[in-house]
């Protein structure tokens, strides 16, 4: 994978797409051969990451010390993830069309809105490789079309930078 490339990895469930993503992030031990990775900042987002964040939020909310009117972090706080790049956060939110979500509680967002917030969080880290693992899982057909349009716009813009993309996409066999 070279800078400014856009890859789509397609395969059935269990075919190794997520393992490939882990290998790209140096999170999977090499069994044999040689692996050379020139990417310095690899970011990924997936349905699993979304689920983990929501579970952690619910766990934090389900205790006696929590105010019942508190719903965790806002979308802005989730994007910033402890960082302080507020201006860049708002620029990314504008590019993704989610500025109206920034002050809403993350836990109250729809699946598609949550995904966009997590994409913004990944982009805030200024990755040189971005891995989107099953970005359309759980989205309706219109949301998938909206996402494809948004990703195509981001892809055009990223060609000016050194960002490379890998999208993992499951194919369901019919018949």
Residue ranges of predicted features:
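Hydrophobic anchor residue at the start of the ABC signature
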Residues: 119
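Helix N-cap at the start of a conserved alpha-helix in ABC-type nucleotide-binding domains
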Residues: 141-143
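ABC ATPase nucleotide-binding domain signature region
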Residues: 18-83
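Catalytic Walker B motif of ABC-type/P-loop ATPase nucleotide-binding domains
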Residues: 130-134
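Conserved ABC ATPase signature
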Residues: 105-109
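Conserved catalytic loops of ABC-family nucleotide-binding domains
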Residues: 150-167
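Conserved ABC ATPase "signature" region
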Residues: 84-101
């Amino acid at each position: 994978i070279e800078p400014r490339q856009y890859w789509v990895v397609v395969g059935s469930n269990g075919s190794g797409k997520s393992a490939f993503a882990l290998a790209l992030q140096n999170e999977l031990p090499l069994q044999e051969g040689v692996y050379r990775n020139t990417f310095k900042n690899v970011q990924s987002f997936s349905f699993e990451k979304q689920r983990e964040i929501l579970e952690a939020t619910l766990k934090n909310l389900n205790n006696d010390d929590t105010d019942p009117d508190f719903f965790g972090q806002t979308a802005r706080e989730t994007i910033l993830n402890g960082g302080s790049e507020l201006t860049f956060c708002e620029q990314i939110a504008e590019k993704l069309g989610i500025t109206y979500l920034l002050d809403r509680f993350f836990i109250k967002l729809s699946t598609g809105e949550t995904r966009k917030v997590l994409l913004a969080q990944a982009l805030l880290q200024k990755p040189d490789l971005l891995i989107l693992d099953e970005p359309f899982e759980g989205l309706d057909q219109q949301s998938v079309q909206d996402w494809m349009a948004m990703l195509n716009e981001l892809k055009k813009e990223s060609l000016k930078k050194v960002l490379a993309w890998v999208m993992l996409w499951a194919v369901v066999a019919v018949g």
